From Swiss-Prot:
It comes from Finegoldia magna (strain ATCC 29328 / DSM 20472 / WAL 2508). InterPro entries: Pept_tRNA_hydro, Pept_tRNA_hydro_CS, Pept_tRNA_hydro_sf. Belongs to the PTH family. Monomer. SUPFAM superfamilies: Peptidyl-tRNA hydrolase-like (SSF53178). The lineage of its organism: Bacteria, Bacillati, Bacillota, Tissierellia, Tissierellales. The record marks 9 as: Discriminates between blocked and unblocked aminoacyl-tRNA. Its main location: cytoplasm. GO terms for cellular component: cytoplasm. This is Peptidyl-tRNA hydrolase. PROSITE patterns: PEPT_TRNA_HYDROL_1, PEPT_TRNA_HYDROL_2. The gene is pth.
Length: 189
């Protein structure tokens, strides 16, 4: 079983902000897998289904970004999951726009959602799919990640979202290394 968690903030105010790229990928993945993400459980909206024979839980934590680890920990405890069964999808401001980056494990960097998860599950050993949301050199970081995309940027983001949901499927079907080799370094621009 895999828990695939897309990070973001709940509510229409944040729906199309840069910080909600993880939620957008979960929505796309749910469409591709015909899974309804509409059940309230684990401080989240979740949906359950399968990728091949592997059970998956798609999750959109409703705890707000900085407390994402609370929702994931609740699910971990309920299903007795380990870090190897977790895929986290989140926004990233450090990789080139038009790309995604898959990592097998690692630190949180500046991402508070990842910091919360690492702290609460006490492990950095989980896969993550980082979705580029553009690079910021003009604005306060908080203002930037809570801003919306321009129409032109959103067209690029939609391609990144499609690639990210495909990558999540390949991680489950194959493994993280396979997904890294097939998606890292590719640009949708």
């Amino acid at each position: 079983m895999y828990l695939i968690a897309g990070l973001g903030n709940p509510g229409s105010k944040y729906e199309y902000t840069r910080h909600n790229a993880g939620f957008m990928v979960i929505d796309d993945l749910a469409k591709k897998l015909n899974i309804k993400v509409n059940k309230l459980k684990f401080k989240s909206l979740i949906g359950e289904g399968f990728i091949g024979d592997e059970k998956v839980i798609l999750m959109k934590p409703s705890t707000y970004m900085n407390d994402s680890g609370k929702a994931i920990l609740d699910c971990f405890n309920y299903y007795n999951l380990s870090a190897e069964n977790l895929i986290v999808i989140c926004d990233d401001i450090d990789i080139p726009f038009g790309t995604i980056r898959i990592k097998k494990k690692g630190s949180a960097g500046t991402h508070n959602g990842l910091k919360s998860i690492i702290y609460l599950i006490e492990s950095q050993d989980f896969a993550r799919i980082k979705v580029s949301v553009g690079q910021n050199d003009k604005y306060d970081l908080k203002d930037f990640v809570l801003s919306q995309f321009s129409k032109k940027e959103f067209e690029v983001l939609e391609k990144e979202i499609d690639m990210s949901s495909d990558a999540a499927i390949k991680i489950v079907e194959e493994n993280v290394d396979y997904a890294m080799n097939n998606f890292n370094g590719k640009s949708v621009i």
